[in-house]
Amino acid sequence: MGSTEFSWKLADHPKLPKGKTLAMVVLDGWGEASANQYNCIHVAETPTMDSLKQGAPEKWRLIRAHGKAVGLPTEDDMGNSEVGHNALGAGRIYAQGAKLVDLALESGKIYDGEGFNYIKESFETNTLHLIGLLSDGGVHSRLDQLQLLLKGSAERGAKRIRVHILTDGRDVLDGSSVGFVETLENDLAQLRAKGVDAQIASGGGRMYVTMDRYENDWSVVKRGWDAQVLGEAPYKFKNAVEAVKTLRQEPKANDQYLPPFVVVDESGKAVGPIVDGDAVVTLNFRADRMVMLAKALEYEDFDKFDRVRFPKIRYAGMLQYDGELKLPNRYLVSPPEIERTSGEYLVHNGVRTFACSETVKFGHVTFFWNGNRSGYFKPEMEEYVEIPSDSGITFNVQPKMKALEIAEKARDAILSGKFDQVRVNLPNSDMVGHTGDIEATVVACKAADEAVKMIIDAIEQVGGIYVITADHGNAEDMVKRDKKGQPAMDKNGNIQILTSHTLEPVPIAIGGPGLTPGVRFRNDIPTGGLANVAATVMNLHGFEAPSDYEPTLIEVVSN
């Protein structure tokens, strides 16, 4: 259809009224799995979510939140908050980060793009630096993509390459870092055999070095900057394998929190600081934990920490991490073009919207929900509230996080009568689940359940509707499992804790006094996923969804 014919106007739903206040609650990292001692959601007291489950199959069901249902390449790809909120907000399935990069590398298109040609101008005389998470976790990055980019860059004239690694232990097992570093060292040795000066220059654990997000703790980025750009770190080693093995021997060491190190030559000099004229690529395809480093690498005006030096480099991201900020300005692979999101449609149809979370997930209910777009669609129709997250501690120390404060903001917004949709993300089960602390995660799940109750109580008072769902699994299975599904043990006979997301489906529940009698979940979409939620919510606001949206999960039957 030509652009002249396009209209934001949504058709009225034939059976569902407008004007009901709707609460949209996303429980982060809350999947559905069998009941056992490692299912923190099962172990926790969660009376509200338990009572919603009694509404199955008409008012409660499971939906898919991983793999192809959210645009990821395979059914073995765990969902994550970014792609989950994209799907929830967009109402359609878009090829996502990892998939886009795979396609660009497979076809070789990545090497023809503006981004690669821009960094290539440094190859002849300077160094190519690659910075990113080293694992095959597939949430932020993947080792095989780094391997292909190394090979492709060397074939296209890169003579000197330095890799700045960040160890994982969050999306993959703790302790797996050594194997990944050994694999990479082997690849770099093969490049050296072909005359390319290629080596690892620095490293550190992802949660302590570089990969902070939402400006929670700039010291994390500074530690990375000092090692990567300045070539300075508290630990110096002759090679990265020795570095990771040695640093892991500290009593409480783990891959996520390894301290920063630099690799030095025989004379003790760092082998790969970033200097004027060099090219830099940040390898991660997921945006949230690269944005802060991207700002430090790109912004002339920068006051978050003392950079000491601000080298004149050619910098490109694997993808553009923030479309609104145009950050970074250059990138190797174009992001998914997400347009006509449900949020934009709804404000154009008079739905006044309130969105709230705490810092660690605020971007998810706003930026990612709105198709990777910062800011408001219509400022007079929308209000976004960010509650500052605790900083300087790991989330298992305060597992209740800001669930109560988020619920209070949502309650006040619902009772104010100023909003038609009140949307929140409750981060507890995900953020605390990532710490691997089972007891704390149980506390986190209970806190999230209490927050849901407060929001539902407010909806009851105003005669509204609630939709409760999640973006992916995490807290429902905290143990690594063998092929038979039994808890896996390490060599000392201890249970191997799982800190990552899962492949489990997530619940969705609907209800509230404003729900029209006869509304129930359809039984003809058994493989429904997160992308089906947008049309469902549009229906509950009294509108038909656009024809190209994934179909609604609900129907209205006459009693």
Swiss-Prot record:
Binding sites annotated in the UniProt record for Mn(2+) 1: 430, 434, 501
Coiled-coil ranges per UniProt: none
Main enzyme class: isomerase
Protein EC: 5.4.2.12
Reaction catalyzed: (2R)-2-phosphoglycerate = (2R)-3-phosphoglycerate
Binding site for Mn(2+) 2: 28, 81, 471-472
Cofactor info, note text: Binds 2 manganese ions per subunit.
Superkingdom: Eukaryota
Keyword Manganese listed: yes
Location of the active site: 81 (phosphoserine intermediate)
Gene Ontology biological process terms in this record: glucose catabolic process; glycolytic process
Residues the record lists as binding substrate: 140, 170-171, 206, 213, 286-289, 361
Subunit description: Monomer.
Full protein name: 2,3-bisphosphoglycerate-independent phosphoglycerate mutase
Gene: PGM1
